[in-house]
């Protein structure tokens, strides 16, 4: 409801401003009827002028009445505002509520100044009303309407300021406006004076125990101490106890390989079996259809045991057996009798430092250990050579004719083999150095007399329609097979063209010919 009433007030004020503009626009026209007109013009058709003026006066009267109604409405609204805001403060919007064409644009200000600004605007309304009345009186009392020149009137006295209007009714509560744009950052203030030092704070809680520090770097070595004097010779110690028996010695080297045994006697040869007659060879039948797998037949009777074949040659010697396990240690010997302590010698004088002795010789070998137990049986040796094959057995009966198999599907057509080309382009697919194949080697062509006809024949051998000669293409290596090639352009091969003999040239590889086929 509050927003609708505000819209009505704005429409009402807009219509007031429109009427004020209309009056302002009409007043310059009415200035032609002033008494002090220097050159009064005679009016013809007084009846027509009277009718026009009557209509104009009616319109002015209606406008004045409407303006009066608006003033009364504004007074009621002021009373309502005063009732809502007992302390004289008004909550208003940022845009002006009342503005006139003749009055300065006065915006409503918050709190105490709002009511004063509204009263000032009402006084402007009263002033404009009085001016309209004076203009109306001037029009009605203008002697020119009756073609009578009137005397110039004296200026009227200045009007007294109008009494303040009655406060209007309080208006509806204004809606909350949209959030304004963020203001610009203010200039930084001047740094204030330094405050007094604060009082000493209370002692903080004891912090957690820190992690143990890393180990420090090794310190520098201290100074080398002085060399001490040689100590006195010690007393001869008692004879030590008898040492324990030494460990078993290493396993001895393996013995030499034994002599090969004598070959055994050959066993008696078995009697040969009767040879069967050879059957007639049947005609090869057509490949039959793949038959279904037959039922598994009964197991045949075991055949008569054949005569044993001759005894095979003895097998190779078996692999070396694993070494036997280490024998148990022998029993410890009885301890030796302790020797009597020697007589203490006289303390000798301090001797000089002796020369470092030579390395002693290697001690004698220890007593060999007990013989170990017999080793485990070695793994069996490799299989002997295969015996001689037995004689061929009798030929079996011919089998039954198989059914013809289904005709196989026709195989796919194979890809066409690539034909060997005797010419090629090096350095690109259709542009590069021209090379020919002769005497099982690739070689280049000299560019002497090399022209487009020669290049066209060369490209025709590769399936192109025409070619363009490139002189001094270079970059080749090996043989230079052709020189002074002279084709007419209709040949199918360079072999048909006029040229020097193969390998006869006076060129270097900087003069190798090139082609560009299309």
UniProtKB/Swiss-Prot annotation:
Residues 147-426 are annotated as: Disordered. The chain crosses the membrane at residues 49-69. Residues 154-163, 293-314, 325-344 have a biased composition (Low complexity). Disulfide bonds join 446-507, 459-517, 487-497. Residues 239-250, 410-421 have a biased composition (Basic and acidic residues). Residues 1-48 are cytoplasmic. Its main location: membrane. One of its GO terms (cellular component) is collagen trimer. The keyword Cell membrane applies. Expressed in subpopulations of macrophages in the spleen and the medullary cord of lymph nodes (at protein level). Coiled coil: none annotated. Signal peptide: none annotated. Residues 70-518 are extracellular. Residues 423-518 form the SRCR domain. Keywords: Cell membrane, Collagen, Disulfide bond, Glycoprotein, Immunity, Innate immunity, Membrane, Receptor, Signal-anchor, Transmembrane, Transmembrane helix. GO terms for molecular function: amyloid-beta binding; cargo receptor activity; G protein-coupled receptor binding. The keyword Transmembrane helix applies. SUPFAM superfamilies: SRCR-like. It is a single-pass type II membrane protein. InterPro entries: Collagen, SRCR, SRCR-like_dom_sf. Glycans are attached at residues 87, 138. Homotrimer; disulfide-linked. Trimers may assemble in larger oligomers thus resulting in the creation of a large surface capable of interacting with very large ligands. Pattern recognition receptor (PRR) which binds Gram-positive and Gram-negative bacteria. Also plays a role in binding of unopsonized particles by alveolar macrophages. Binds to the secretoglobin SCGB3A2. This is Macrophage receptor MARCO.
């Amino acid at each position: 409801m509050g927003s609708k009433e505000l819209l009505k007030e704005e429409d009402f004020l807009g219509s007031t401003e429109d009427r004020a503009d209309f009056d302002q626009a009409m007043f310059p026209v009415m200035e032609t009827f002033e008494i002090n007109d220097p050159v009064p013009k005679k009016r013809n058709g007084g009846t027509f002028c009277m009718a026009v003026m009557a209509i104009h006066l009616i319109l002015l009267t209606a406008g004045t009445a409407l303006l009066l109604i608006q003033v009364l409405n504004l007074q009621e609204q002021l009373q309502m505002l005063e009732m809502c805001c007992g302390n004289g403060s008004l909550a208003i919007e940022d845009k002006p509520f009342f503005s006139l064409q003749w009055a300065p644009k006065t915006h409503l200000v918050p709190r105490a100044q709002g009511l004063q600004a509204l009263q000032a605007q009402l006084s402007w309304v009263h002033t404009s009303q009085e001016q309209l009345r004076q203009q109306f009186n001037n029009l009605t009392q203008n002697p020119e309407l009756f073609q009578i020149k009137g005397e110039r009137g004296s200026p009227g006295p200045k009007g007294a300021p109008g009494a303040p209007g009655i406060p209007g009714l309080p208006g509806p509560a204004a809606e909350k406006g949209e959030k304004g744009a963020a203001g610009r950052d203010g200039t930084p203030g001047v740094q204030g004076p330094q405050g007094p030092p604060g009082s000493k704070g209370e002692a903080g809680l004891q912090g957690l125990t820190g992690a143990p520090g890393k180990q420090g770097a090794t310190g520098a070595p201290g100074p080398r101490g002085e060399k001490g004097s040689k100590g006195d010779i010690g007393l001869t110690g008692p004879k030590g106890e008898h040492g324990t028996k030494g460990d078993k010695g290493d396993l001895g080297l393996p013995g030499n390989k034994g002599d090969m045994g004598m070959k055994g006697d050959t066993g008696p040869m078995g009697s040969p079996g009767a040879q069967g007659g050879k059957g007639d060879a049947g005609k090869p039948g057509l490949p039959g259809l793949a038959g279904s797998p037959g039922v598994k037949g009964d197991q045949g009777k075991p055949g008569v045991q054949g005569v044993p074949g001759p005894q095979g040659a003895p097998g190779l010697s078996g692999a070396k057996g694993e070494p036997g396990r280490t024998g148990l240690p022998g029993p410890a010997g009885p301890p030796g009798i302790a020797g009597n302590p020697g007589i203490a010698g006289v303390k000798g004088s301090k001797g000089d430092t002796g020369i470092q002795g030579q390395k002693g010789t290697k001690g004698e070998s220890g007593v060999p250990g007990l013989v170990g137990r017999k080793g485990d049986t070695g793994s069996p040796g490799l299989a002997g050579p295969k015996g001689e094959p037995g004689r061929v057995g009798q030929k079996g009966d011919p089998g039954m004719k198989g059914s013809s198999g289904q005709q196989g599907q026709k195989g796919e057509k194979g890809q066409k083999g690539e034909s060997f080309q005797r010419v090629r382009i090096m350095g690109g697919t259709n542009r590069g150095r021209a090379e020919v194949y002769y005497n099982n080697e690739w070689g280049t062509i000299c560019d002497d007399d090399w022209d487009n006809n020669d290049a066209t024949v060369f490209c025709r051998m590769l399936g192109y329609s025409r070619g363009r000669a490139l002189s001094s293409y270079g970059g080749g290596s090996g043989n230079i097979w052709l020189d002074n090639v002279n084709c007419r352009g209709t040949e199918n091969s360079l072999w048909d063209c006029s040229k020097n003999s193969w390998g006869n040239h006076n060129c270097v590889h900087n003069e190798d010919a090139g082609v560009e086929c299309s």
